[in-house]
Amino acid sequence: MQKPAKIEEAWGRKYPEQVVLAITKAPDGRVNAMAIGWVCIVSDDPPMFLLGIDDPAFTLELIRNNKEFVIAYPSSEMAKETLYFGTVHGHSEDKGAKSGLKFIPAEKVDVPLLADAVANFECRLVTEYRPGNCPLVVGEVIASHVNTDDSVKRLVNCGKGYQLK
């Protein structure tokens, strides 16, 4: 059975949803990361992700300038750090260093991987477009990595107000 509902009520029923970190690198070498819920796989040949990133996010600026980024699926142990990445702006803050998380070199891009993530995907920017008020970024996956510990669980967003578990 269905009933008419305001969009906010209907959107509230989508949880739990995935959350990823879009990792970028500033010109001065700082590691920047942003928590993103608007993400999906849009192609498997070639493999591609689509991200919705609010403008004027520092992450979006870095992706536009560098043409590369990493998508990391944080573990359930990273809720505090993921919340930090999603609520603090990177223009003037060294988010990578202040998070306390470990980053390691990637294979094909000049952006680090999140060492203890469930999975990391090295991406090159394919295109960006704006069908509504939020820019959409498409990145082609050029390398992927998984955690060697299969018991590491993925972090999910369980509701409005950053209910990360």
Model-identified regions with their sequence ranges:
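Basic, polyanion-binding surface patches
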Residues: 1-165
